[in-house]
Design a protein with these regions (language model features):
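A sequence-level detector of short linear motifs
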Residues: 26, 61, 221, 236, ...
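Conserved functional hotspot residues or short segments at active or partner-binding sites
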Residues: 234-326
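A broadly conserved detector of short glycine/acidic/proline-rich loop/turn motifs that flank catalytic sites
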Residues: 68, 91, 176, 201, ...
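Polar, glycine-rich mid-to-C-terminal structural blocks
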Residues: 181, 193, 200, 204-272
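Structural motif
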Residues: 14-16
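Cleft-lining beta-strand/loop regions that shape enzyme active-site pockets
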Residues: 1-12, 21-24, 28-216
Length: 328
């Protein structure tokens, strides 16, 4: 983990732990739970780890000071072309905005003018984090999202206009697992014609829920409102039937929606115009991309599953990372 206790002492991704405090954990019958018990301990205590690293003949021993492991939102940020940067966000947490600003500053120093924001597989997170991220792209007083319910009053959230990336070209990558807070950001970008959305229709999760504590210590979440994009599209997909709702992604696959753009049909009642360019976009749940990219069906073949099961792909990845590290 970046900036975690192990990284601070020099342990690298791909290193294999073979012993904890002189007790072997490799080549012996030991459950994952038992291994984790040996690795974990009070904050500030120390643990000795014996590591095997590819390309190094002798085992390496590191003394790690146990500490809180940071949970980061950014998986990657780098330049893919001389003027184009790439940032991947895996979740919207308390530090997302700070991490994004730091990555943006670093990329802009490298000459970034355009940005690809990858929200594929991002299941959402904190509303405030989504608003802060959308604020980086939108102008002052531009609506980011609003909530409204049958009895809940409309609540609106606007951009402050002080973002660090309000003019460069922007592409947002989404897929069928892009949900909630991610859809708030991508919906705002699309409705204001700030950038283009590329990929497949997002999940369609946009409910506002109020937690209610019960006397026995349990809790229920009561849905009181829904999220709407600036143009008035409801992010939440229909959930009249729990069976249909739970099988939605399977049905998308079976109907060809994940492979062919022309298999997706919307009634005229779901057509909405964007705020500036008056382009036609669609409601009905989820964010429909401007440019469709079919799903990579290679992931579902027996051949691919066999490679994954035998560890071939992870071994190749580790070898590639090591070679790149030596070259740099």
């Amino acid at each position: 983990v970046s900036n975690g206790p192990s990284e601070k002492v020099g342990i690298l991704a791909g290193d294999r732990i073979i012993a904890v405090n002189d007790s072997a954990i490799a080549g012996v019958k030991m459950s994952t739970e038992d291994i984790m018990k040996r690795l974990r301990g009070p904050k500030g205590s120390k643990v000795n780890l014996t590591i095997v690293r590819r390309g190094v003949q002798e085992p390496l021993i590191f003394t790690v000071k146990r500490d809180k492991i940071p949970i980061l939102s950014l998986d990657a940020s780098y330049m893919i072309q001389p003027k184009t940067g790439y940032i991947r966000i895996n979740r919207f947490g308390a530090t997302t905005a700070e991490e994004f600003k730091k990555a943006m500053t670093a990329l802009q120093k490298q000459g970034m003018k355009d940005l690809i924001l990858d929200l594929q597989g991002n299941g959402g997170g904190y509303l405030n984090a989504a608003i802060d991220l959308a604020n980086e792209f939108l102008g002052q007083k531009e609506l980011i999202v609003y909530t409204e319910g049958r009895t809940a009053q409309r609540s609106e959230f606007f951009a402050k206009g002080n973002g660090d990336f309000r003019t460069g070209r922007l592409i947002v990558l989404v897929d069928e697992y892009t949900a909630s807070a991610s859809e708030i950001v991508s919906g705002a970008v699309q409705d204001w014609d700030r950038g283009i959305i590329v990929g497949r229709r997002s999940f369609g999760k946009g409910l506002v829920q109020r937690p209610i504590d019960l006397p026995d210590g349990s809790m229920i979440r009561l849905t009181i409102a829904r999220y709407y994009t600036p143009a008035g599209r409801c992010i939440q997909k229909p959930y009249d039937s729990s069976t249909d709702y739970n099988k939605d992604l399977i049905e998308r696959f079976n109907h060809g929606e994940l492979m062919n753009a022309d298999s997706i049909h919307f009634p005229d009642s779901l057509k909405v115009q964007t705020k500036k360019l008056k382009r036609t976009v669609y409601g009905g749940g989820g964010i429909m991309p401007d440019y469709f990219v079919p799903i990579d069906t290679t992931l579902y073949t027996d051949y691919h599953r066999n490679l994954v099961g035998k560890g071939v792909i992870i071994k190749f990845t580790m070898k590639f990372i090591e070679e790149i590290g030596r070259a740099s």
